[in-house]
A protein has these predicted regions:
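Bacterial N-terminal signal peptides
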Residues: 1-6
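Sequence context of c-type cytochrome heme-c attachment sites
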Residues: 10-168, 176, 182-204
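Short Cys/His-centered divalent metal-binding micro-motifs
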Residues: 131, 178, 215, 219
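Outer-membrane beta-barrel translocator/pore domains, especially the C-terminal barrels
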Residues: 167-170, 223-225
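Short, conserved sequence motifs used for protein processing/export or organelle targeting and
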Residues: 200-207, 212-213, 217-395
Length: 395
């Protein structure tokens, strides 16, 4: 299947600087005339015309950006820290007003009543978070109409049509929330989030392959990533071999290659990937022989980096070791690759529960416990490769 590539400037331009100028303004715009239905910004309202996008969004992490994992932290963060989190987790001032007293001003509450007349049941990232500013709709170029055709039709389209912005098909559009600011904290010379920078220096960027080409194929609004096994599998290639050494030991050479990922794998400091090698007996019992970890490990206070073993695009993580094989006990060799998408959160949340659990309110503690359980459940086995023993090994 071919993908359409967008050759656009990846530097922040004036549109993006204004579009993501936090905190965002309310949707007040007296110059725009809309009906009550048109001015209703509830995602369910958008679904009347954009059903596929709505259904995809419902299952996405964008639709879950305000959940137990962030809500419990409100009790331990300062107002300033909490509101800063909301810039990306709940960009609209109207949705922020649901979870932050700072945004419960007369102007914002008026705007919320007008544009969300049925209330806001989910104050996460919504359609309007990306597509609407001051009651003007923005989006990528139409795939079916020319610019002239679109201009002719605008007056007859709902909500006065939309303003075409090519930036919607640019990686730079995603940068403000998926890349630490230049002034942000660094560990070992690297920001906590550098996915845009990681991509910018790759062949993917040089070929014009944007974030959207992989994470929004055919403009799909599920934004699949590290939590989706099939999506991750498509970007990696595991291979391994066994040889017998002169003294009878078994030499294992394994390689996990990044073949379709436009940034480091895994990006960010949150996920970890475990490459484990087992010997398995005739009863199916396994014994761990070797383990190698992919990821960027930092402490929970975000003050020290212990290691960074992530794979850069097009490169591989190699594991080579020898061991003495008990051929009577071990019948199979397994190479298992497990992904823990939320490893850092799990470690951090467990520490918070242990050290602060008794200081938290009952509701907040429950949110923390629920989030911790959810994140532990996100682990999955990405690949399992097996070779029988005895095997035909080169001498």
């Amino acid at each position: 299947m071919s993908i359409g590539l967008s050759i656009v400037s990846c530097k922040k331009d004036s549109f993006l600087s204004e579009h993501w100028n936090h905190p965002l303004s309310t949707q007040r715009n007296p110059e725009v005339q809309l009906t009550q239905i048109e001015s209703n910004l509830d995602p369910k309202q958008c679904a009347n015309c954009h059903e596929n996008q709505f259904k995809a969004w419902q299952s996405s992490f964008h639709a879950k950006s305000i959940g137990n994992g962030i809500l419990w932290q409100k009790e331990i963060l300062s107002f300033e820290e909490w509101n800063r989190c909301l810039h990306c987790h709940s960009p609209l001032p109207e949705t922020k007003a649901e979870i932050s007293e700072t945004f419960q001003t007369h102007e914002i509450l008026d705007s919320k009543r007008k544009h969300f007349p049925s209330g806001i049941s989910n104050p996460s990232i919504q359609c309007a978070s990306c597509h609407i500013r001051n009651q003007i709709w923005y989006g990528p170029p139409s795939r079916n109409l020319t610019a002239n055709q679109l201009t002719t039709l605008q007056a007859n389209l709902p909500h006065n049509g939309f303003k075409v912005q090519e930036e919607f098909e640019s990686s730079a559009f995603c940068q403000s929330c998926h890349e630490s600011p230049e002034s942000g904290q660094k560990l070992n010379g690297k920001h906590l989030m550098e996915v845009y920078q990681e991509w910018e220096n790759t062949s993917f960027a040089k070929k014009g392959i944007q974030c959207q080409n992989c994470h929004m194929p055919n403009r799909d609004h599920t934004w699949k990533g590290i939590h989706d096994p099939d999506f991750v599998r498509a970007g990696l290639q595991p291979s391994w071999s066994l040889t017998r050494t002169a003294n009878g030991e078994i030499q294992i050479d394994a390689k996990l290659k990044s073949i379709g990922i436009g940034h480091k794998f895994p990006t960010y400091l949150i996920p970890k990937v475990y490459l484990r090698f087992f010997g398995k007996n005739q009863f199916g019992n396994r014994k761990l022989i070797e383990e190698s970890i992919l990821g960027r490990l930092v402490n929970t206070n975000l003050t020290e980096e212990y290691y960074d073993t992530r794979i850069t695009p097009g490169n591989s993580h190699n594991v080579s070791f020898r061991f003495t094989l008990d051929e009577k006990a071990i019948k199979t060799l397994d190479w298992e690759i497990e992904v823990d998408p939320d490893e850092h959160y799990i470690r951090s949340f467990e520490e918070s529960l242990r050290e602060k659990g008794n200081l938290l309110s009952a509701e907040t503690k429950k949110q923390l416990q629920l989030s911790l359980s959810e994140k532990k459940d996100s682990r999955y086995v990405l690949f399992t490769l097996s070779l029988p023993v005895p095997v035909s090994l080169p001498k």
